[in-house]
Design a protein with these regions (language model features):
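Glycine-centered structural positions embedded in regular secondary structure
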Residues: 14, 93-96, 197, 203
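Conserved SGNH/GDSL esterase-like catalytic core that processes O-acyl groups on lipids
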Residues: 51-127, 145-152, 156
Length: 205
């Protein structure tokens, strides 16, 4: 439909502009511009996966959700170093990344699994991404909890950050988990490790 409209616009503007009211010309030009913008966004998204580097060494930074799955993650992704802690917030990860960089132990691929313990804003998330650097591939795991009140408040900035940073990708744990209650323990938040670890491996491979 977009292509058809664009062709009509080009024909009208190129061959019949003298016969068209100025308002109609402006509307057609606006539609043509919107079509071009949509196409550019689609092209940018399509080209994004090709910018991924090989996985290489992997660092995973998370909270208690990742902590519970740490042994399974390390077994499933042997080159992965897991740094996870209960009640960890996004802003705390900035200092962790700084420390790992100073020790020259931050992986080529960084998995972030934070946001379960409270919402955060895009600015804080961007500070973390900037600290990790554009030369690394980042995967941010969306949060999920059957009774997690701020799930959307955490996932909205995660999705926004992936859109505005070419090296940031989403691991949609929330999307995958909603149809699989059997993946979780009784609290509806903490998960059975094997499913989580396998999702991480599949997403970064």
């Amino acid at each position: 439909m977009l292509v058809a409209v664009a062709l009509v616009c080009i024909f009208c503007i190129g061959h019949g502009s003298a016969l068209m009211p100025s308002e109609t010309k402006e509307e057609l030009q606006q539609v043509q511009g919107e079509n071009q913008k949509q196409q550019e966004e689609q092209d940018a998204q399509a080209s994004k996966p090709s910018s991924r580097k090989s996985v290489g060494s992997v660092t995973a930074i998370g909270d208690s959700v990742m902590l519970g799955a740490a042994p399974a993650i390390q077994e499933t992704i042997p080159d992965c170093v897991v740094d996870a802690k209960e009640s960890r917030q996004v802003k705390e990860a900035i200092e962790i990344v700084k420390s790992l960089e100073q020790q020259d132990t931050l992986g080529d691929t960084v998995i972030i699994a934070l946001g379960t313990n409270g919402p955060f804003d895009v600015s804080t998330g961007q500070d973390l991404i900037d600290q990790i650097g554009k030369d690394r591939t980042i995967y941010w795991v969306t949060v999920y909890g059957e009774y997690l009140q701020w799930q959307d408040e955490s996932n909205d900035p995660i999705n926004a950050l992936a859109k505005q940073n070419y090296n940031v990708y989403i691991i949609d744990w929330a999307g995958a988990a909603v149809d699989h209650p059997e993946w979780f323990w009784k609290d509806g938040i903490h998960l059975r490790p094997e499913a989580y670890a396998q999702l991480l491996l599949t997403s970064i491979s």
